[in-house]
From Swiss-Prot:
Name recorded for this polypeptide: CCR4-NOT transcription complex subunit 3
Subunit structure: Component of the CCR4-NOT complex; distinct complexes seem to exist that differ in the participation of probably mutually exclusive catalytic subunits. In the complex interacts directly with CNOT2. Interacts with TIP120B and NANOS2. Interacts with EBF1. Interacts in an RNA-independent manner with BICC1 (via KH domains).
Record's keyword terms, sorted: Cytoplasm, Developmental protein, Nucleus, Phosphoprotein, Repressor, RNA-mediated gene silencing, Transcription, Transcription regulation, Translation regulation
Record organism: Mus musculus
Modified residues (Phosphothreonine): T292
GO cellular component: CCR4-NOT complex; CCR4-NOT core complex; cytosol; nucleus; P-body
Biased composition (Basic and acidic residues): 284-293
Compositionally biased intervals (Polar residues): 294-315, 339-348, 463-472
Gene it is expressed from: Cnot3
Transmembrane segments: none
Keyword Cytoplasm: yes
UniProt cross-references to Gene3D superfamilies, sorted A to Z: CCR4-NOT complex subunit 2/3/5, C-terminal domain
Example GO biological process: regulation of DNA-templated transcription
Bias-annotated ranges (Pro residues): 317-330
Matching Pfam families: NOT2_3_5_C (PF04153), Not3 (PF04065)
Length: 751
């Protein structure tokens, strides 16, 4: 009886210890999980280990009592044993977590901890991708079936069932492609975080039902499947798959240019053909603000002769394709086409703005350039003395005679060439030159009078033409006239009138040309007075050009700078006449280069882009240097510091000998070697160390000394125990089993 009471008392004490131990274990467990740093975790883990050891001893005691037959009621003992085993399992988990190295097999095998929201997003994205793939596969199957059925129906005509099946398959293909398009848009929105995952989950069941059952006869499609996602309001960047073709403005320009009747002397734009360019290339060029070669031709009205193409290349001005070398035009020259009864008319401007000879101005479909260039065409023909033209005339590429012999004073080279105005070029010149007279020349064979402007100071020698068009005169009397201002699609140019001062003698008026014939279709003729008005001052001309450049700002993609012929005449005749005027100097108008790069103006940056730009700008001021990756060395200033007079002011005698250095301690020698680089002291310290059987390792930059005889010696290395001086920790270390390769041994004989 006493034994039983004693045993029961022991059991009660043991169970009490178990409950206290479990409570203590729980407390330490909580502290371990709330620990802020690794040191605390290690401490709590050690405490946990002690506590679990105590519990394990109590468990062993409980197990012996459970196994004995003396105790009848063992339920309490078994419960406490299970409680201890539960704590042991929990400790194993902690031990596994702390002992698992980051790059061990177990550590690498553990599942990566992923943010639940990110994981959900990836799952939905994967589902969208799989659904799109499934739909595309079904589309391929439908298309192959349609193809095979089409072959069969061609052989057997009138098979209505197969025709119905083909129609049904085509409807399925169309529906599938619609869903693929929508799902791809949703996927892009998901990648850009512009749609919620929950919104996609709402349509998931309907989409899966469509994919699985779209071909069932009793299938009912949900037509409002994507309505809740507001796919109509998504940004254009998410759905645009190809660049738009022609903008509305370009279509309008094209319609205007094609609907305007072409006069006998107006230049009409040639649409791009496969021989010279493609629509896609020209579109790309427009987008980039580049200029392509302009192709403009004069259209003879009645003679059916071929239009003349003028391809201008500023890189080779010595041999321009369509311009004979002669005086270059500044603003205009008068040309006439013999096909119209020889009527002389002012030639229309042949810039990229389009023909302006007819009353309604027509526009070439060039770039909607905000950089209208106020230019007079530059000299493209080489070193010839430039002569100005009357303001009512227009440059022509070369006025040819008729089939008969031309009189010797007809200027076949009156037309100079305008070099190609590149859309990315920011400089446009306004040129003014010496005075000129209007000379009248009549062509013989076709009774057509061809008026041209040329210098009268010297003999009129016709310059040889280098182009095919101007060198061949048509026998039917068709004059080959090439356009003079070859401004291309890179940007429209604004023709600024540049008046000239008259010679002392009166010049023949343009009214004499009316005797040759009447104007059929073209603008009203202008007859000049015997005295041509003098030019405005250059400052007003420059201000005109600057106003033109300023008014075509970045904000306005379609500039409205179009001068009519009336404006040109009025502005050119407004200044009072003067008897003599020195030649005007060259002036330039500057237009920002950025307009050539982005003709539609710069796109405003987002906040994120502005932030990135600021960060890049800041980083640019602190560029990394190769020395940034080097080990930081202690800086020892070399400047002498004042010392008290009772210290030695001179180094001791014989302190620069090897014997002196050999008497120094090893640590002092190492200090001299590592911190007095490039000095004689370093050299002497190295010499002293070598005499003490230290050897320098060039790979580790450390001094090694044999601790014992090497265990292995070969021609390439020796292996054994070494003592080395660690200059970073500043102390000697022992390394066992070190392989000293002789190729890293610094073995120069220090003399």
């Amino acid at each position: 009886m006493a034994d039983k009471r004693k045993l029961q008392g022991e059991i009660d004490r043991c169970l009490k210890k178990v409950s206290e131990g479990v409570e203590q274990f729980e407390d330490i467990w909580q502290k371990l999980h709330n620990a802020a740093n690794a040191n605390q975790k290690e401490k709590y883990e050690a405490d946990l280990k002690k506590e679990i050891k105590k519990l394990q001893r109590l468990r062993d005691q409980i197990k012996t009592w459970v196994a004995s037959n003396e105790i009848k009621d063992k339920r309490q003992l078994i419960e406490n044993r299970k409680l201890i085993e539960t704590q042991m399992e929990r400790f194993k988990v902690v031990e596994r977590e702390t002992k698992t190295k980051a790059y061990s097999k177990e550590g690498l095998g553990l599942a990566q901890k992923v943010d639940p929201a990110q994981k959900e997003k990836e799952e939905v994205g994967q589902w969208l991708t799989n659904t799109i793939d499934t739909l595309n596969m079904q589309v391929d199957q439908f298309e192959s079936e349609v193809e095979s059925l089409s072959v069969q129906t061609r052989k057997k005509k009138g098979d209505k069932d197969k025709q119905d099946r083909i129609e049904g398959l085509k409807r399925h293909i169309e529906k599938h492609r619609y869903h693929v398009r929508m799902l791809e848009t949703i996927l892009r929105m998901l990648d850009n975080d512009s749609i919620l995952v929950d919104a996609i989950r709402k349509i998931k069941d309907d989409v899966e039902y469509y994919v699985d059952s779209s071909q069932d006869p009793d299938f009912e499609e949900n037509e409002f499947l994507y309505d809740d996602l507001d796919l109509e309001d998504i940004p254009q960047a998410l759905v645009a798959t190809s660049p738009p073709s022609h903008s509305h403005m370009e279509d309008e320009i094209f319609n205007q240019s094609s609907s305007t009747p072409t006069s006998t002397t107006s230049s009409s734009p040639i649409p791009p053909s496969p021989a010279n360019c493609t629509t896609e290339n020209s579109e790309d060029d427009k987008k980039r603000g580049r200029s392509t070669d302009s192709e403009v031709s004069q259209s003879p009205a009645k003679n059916g002769s071929k239009p003349v193409h003028s391809n201008q290349h500023p890189q080779s001005p010595a041999v321009p394709p369509t311009y004979p070398s002669g005086p270059p035009p500044t603003t205009s020259a008068l040309s006439s086409t013999p096909g119209n009864n020889g009527a002389s008319t002012p030639a229309a401007p042949t810039s990229a703005l389009g023909p302006k000879a007819s009353p309604a101005p027509s526009h070439n479909s060039g770039t909607p350039a905000p950089y209208a260039q106020a230019v007079a065409p530059p000299n493209a023909s080489g070193p010839s003395n430039a002569q100005p033209r009357p303001p009512s005339a227009q440059p022509s590429g070369g006025s040819g005679g008729g089939s008969g012999g031309s009189s010797s004073n007809s200027n076949s080279g009156t037309g100079g060439g305008a070099g190609k105005q590149n859309g990315a070029t920011s400089y446009s010149s306004v040129v003014a030159d010496s005075p000129a007279e209007v000379t009248l020349s009549s062509s013989g064979g076709s009774s057509a009078s061809s008026q041209a402007l040329g210098p009268t100071s010297g003999p009129h020698n016709p310059a040889p033409s280098t182009s095919k068009e101007s060198s061949t005169a048509a026998p039917s009397g068709a004059g080959n006239v090439a356009s003079g201002s070859g401004n291309n699609s890179g940007g429209p140019s604004l023709l600024v009138p540049l008046p000239v001062n008259p010679p002392s003698s009166p010049t023949p008026s343009f009214s004499e040309a009316k005797a040759a014939g009447t104007l059929l279709n073209g603008p009203p003729q202008f007859s000049t007075t015997p005295e041509i008005k003098a030019p405005e001052p250059l400052s007003s001309l420059k201000s005109m050009a600057e106003r033109a450049a300023i008014s075509s700002g970045i904000e306005d993609p379609v500039p409205t700078l179009h001068l009519t012929d009336r404006d040109i005449i009025l502005s050119s005749t407004s200044a009072p006449p003067t008897s003599s005027q020195p030649p005007l100097q060259l002036s330039e108008v500057n237009i920002p280069l950025s307009l050539g790069v982005c003709p539609l103006g710069p796109v405003s940056l987002t906040k994120e882009q502005l932030y990135q730009q600021a960060m890049e700008e800041a980083a640019w001021h602190h560029m990394p240097h190769p020395s940034d990756s080097e080990r930081i060395r202690q800086y020892l200033p070399r400047n002498p510091c004042p010392t008290p007079p009772y210290h030695h002011q001179m180094p001791p005698p014989h302190s620069d000998t090897v014997e002196f250095y050999q008497r120094l301690s090893t640590e002092t020698l190492f200090f001299i070697f590592y911190y007095l680089e490039g000095t004689k002291a370093q050299y002497l310290a190295a010499k002293a160390l070598k005499k003490q059987s230290w050897r320098f390792h060039t790979k580790y930059m450390m001094w090694f000394q044999r601790h014992e005889e090497p265990k292995t010696i070969t021609d390439e290395f020796e292996q054994g125990t070494y003592i080395y001086f660690d200059y970073e920790k500043w102390g000697q270390r022992k390394k066992e089993g070190f392989t000293f390769e002789y190729r890293y041994l610094e073995d120069r004989d220090l003399q």
